[in-house]
């Protein structure tokens, strides 16, 4: 079973933040898979699981997960899910924002994440390894927007604006197409 986890913060306040691009990707992936395989999905709506403190869509082949902890505690939910379902780390994909990659770009890499990402550090700490797949979604655009001096933490909690929204939507479509191949 493949597990694709989108990292983000719960609540409407954070819904369109750069930090929530992981949630955006798994939501778009769920929508695409629902269209491609309508009979295969047991329940295509994200359902809250108290056991894992996460919203989950489950099929026989995969789980889509949105931890409902805040970003910096994402590892708690991920570790519980991996233990419960006996997930091999080679089947785990963590989708997250990445300030080391320019907006409009992404990388899917095994065992390699950004220099600093507290949500990812939480996952690594709780799993005791970094040997899983990282779907690194580029959100860096500070120089173009004239925000070069804005700290990463502040910048990542800001919403996408203007043309960034169009760029992100296009990038999410590409990522989803790659992830469909992973779970198919």
Please state what every model-predicted region is.
Residues 117:
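Hydrophobic secondary-structure segments that place a key small or acidic residue at a functional site
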Residues 114:
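Phosphate- and other anionic-substrate recognition elements at nucleic-acid/protein interfaces
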């Amino acid at each position: 079973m493949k597990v694709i986890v989108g990292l983000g913060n719960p609540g409407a306040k954070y819904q369109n933040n750069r930090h929530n691009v992981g949630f955006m990707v798994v939501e778009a992936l769920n929508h695409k898979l629902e269209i491609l395989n309508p009979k295969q999905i047991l329940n295509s709506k994200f359902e809250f699981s108290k056991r894992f403190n996460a919203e989950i869509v489950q099929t026989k082949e995969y789980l889509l997960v949105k931890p409902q902890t805040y970003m910096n505690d994402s590892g708690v939910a991920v570790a519980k899910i991996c233990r419960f379902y006996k997930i091999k780390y080679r089947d785990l994909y963590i989708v997250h924002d990445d300030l080391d990659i320019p907006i409009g770009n992404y990388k899917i890499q095994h065992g390699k994440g950004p220099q600093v990402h507290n949500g990812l550090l939480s996952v690594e700490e709780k799993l005791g390894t970094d040997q899983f797949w990282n779907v690194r979604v580029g959100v860096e655009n500070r120089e173009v927007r004239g925000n070069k001096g804005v700290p990463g933490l502040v910048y990542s909690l800001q919403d996408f604006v203007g043309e960034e929204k169009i760029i992100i939507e296009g990038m999410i479509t590409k990522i989803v197409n790659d992830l469909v191949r992973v779970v198919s």
